[in-house]
A protein has these predicted regions:
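Patatin-like phospholipase
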Residues: 1-26, 34-265
Length: 265
């Protein structure tokens, strides 16, 4: 739920009509970034607050029943279609490009996808794939590939967006300045449960190296005036899947405050 920090930033940007030409979302950034394009202020916090205690949304019951911590059908289709509708019309009319990043579990390569109208079942499946956490999600099959969380292969896709022609980029991190990633302590679990996907095991074993290199590149681009960085001042007081309403609201508020500071509002 660290992504609610991003949601807070995007809501402030919408409220103050701060427009960008494109967004690339990774993992929770894909789930929440689409709301910027559809101009739905408050939607990300609202549905997460409303659904936090609903076993149909996410939790151990879903994981045991389906192998997915986030219920694939309910969270990514029923919710945006019926319960808290995603504004498909506004998304389709927007000039803002929306891209997501996934990881091919066979090759270990990042897979980039620009999502355009119509906002249909496959559209939401790409968002699901980008945010499908390893170990607690089945790979999502799209375009002949098996896909999981994009953060495994490209956590900070700044170079990708620069190659798309975006010369100055606002980069939102959910870790504070000075953070350096260490090798995950979950490697025994990856080796035990991801044997079918050796590329994923290798990715996770060296992900900290790739991530820290991306941080160095981001710092270089920021110094050169080609990137604006927004990050929390302190470690966000919430876990990736934690569903405490109080903590979710706090993290969202921290995002809003970070945006107000970054844009001098």
């Amino acid at each position: 739920m660290r992504g609610l920090f991003t949601a807070g930033i995007l809501d402030v940007m919408m409220e103050h009509d701060i427009k960008v030409d494109g967004i690339v979302g990774v993992s929770a950034g894909a789930c929440f970034g689409c709301n910027y394009v559809s101009r739905q202020i408050g939607r990300a916090l609202r549905y997460n607050m409303n659904m936090k205690d609903d076993p149909r949304y996410m939790g151990i019951r879903s994981l045991i029943r389906s192998g997915n911590l986030m219920d694939a059908e309910f969270a990514y289709h029923t919710l945006p279609d019926e319960i808290d509708p995603f504004d498909k019309k506004t998304f389709a009319q927007s000039s803002t490009e929306f891209h997501v990043v996934c990881t091919d579990v066979i090759t270990g390569d990042p897979v980039y996808k620009r999502l355009t109208a119509p906002v249909d079942y496959e559209f939401m499946e790409w968002i699901r794939a980008s945010s499908a956490l390893p170990l607690v999600s089945h790979p999502v099959e799209l375009d002949g590939r098996l896909l999981l969380d994009g953060g495994m292969s490209d956590s900070i896709p700044l170079k990708y967006f620069q190659k798309q022609g975006f010369e100055h980029n606002i980069v939102i991190l959910t870790q504070p300045l000075g953070f350096t990633k260490k090798r995950t302590k979950l490697m025994p679990l990856f080796r035990a449960f991801m044997k079918k996907y050796p590329a994923v095991i290798e990715l996770m074993n060296r992900r900290h190296i790739m991530y820290n290199a991306q941080l160095e590149y981001l710092a270089h681009e920021q110094q050169a005036g080609r990137a604006t960085l927004i990050a929390p001042d302190d470690t966000l007081p919430i876990g990736r899947t934690q569903q405490s309403g109080k903590r979710m609201q706090l993290v969202y508020k921290m995002g809003r405050e970070a945006a107000e500071k970054a844009f001098s509002l």
